[in-house]
Amino acid sequence: PKMVEKDNHWFGINAWGGSVCVNTDLLRKKGLSVPRSWSDLLQSEFQDQIVMPNPRASSTGLMFLHGFVQGFGEKKGWEVIEKLHANMLFYAASGARPAAMAAQGEIPIGLSAAAFLKPFLKYKTPVSVVQPEEGIAWDAEACALPRGGPHPQEAKAFWDFCAGPAVGQIAADFSGIAA
């Protein structure tokens, strides 16, 4: 996708989104269905079955909160957050941890970025990614060239590096959605 600011002050390197990472074996053992929506995750059957990143410690966690408020509107978004909180086992200190916990069979459901689950998928772990039917929060990682910075030549060299094929490949490998 084209991720460029109209005045060329910044450009996107890649995009990534929040996902529901589920361990299908654990769900089956606990008699739980695979959630298909955020509404599903608010049901009492999922109490203490979900881990998500702490929004105070993780940009991934903050992205989820922002996505709920943006996607559902402020009033309903905060209602979703409060109901989801009631089902939370705990909040992880990193965005990657809930995906890893689901992949390793520690929890049935981890809210994380699908990109964090990629390394586990090649080992045929019983995990899958669910994109809730209401939509997901997403973010773009970007590069900007600051005006009036103390090292303009170095900043421009970094800009050029970020726009190059090496960073593009890293972005594609990480998130699958390179700019």
Predicted feature descriptions by range:
Residues 1, 5-7, 119-131:
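Ligand-binding "clamshell"
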Residues 1-106:
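Extracytoplasmic ligand-binding site segments that recognize negatively charged/polar headgroups
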Residues 21-26, 139-152, 170-171:
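A bilobed periplasmic-binding-protein/Venus flytrap-type ligand-binding module shared by bacterial periplasmic
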Residues 24, 54, 114-115, 174-175:
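Short secondary-structure boundary segments
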Residues 98-99, 117, 155, 168:
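Short, hydrophobic alpha-helical packing/hinge segments within bilobed ligand-binding/sensory domains
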Residues 103, 107-126:
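A ligand-binding cleft/hinge motif common to bilobed small-molecule-binding domains
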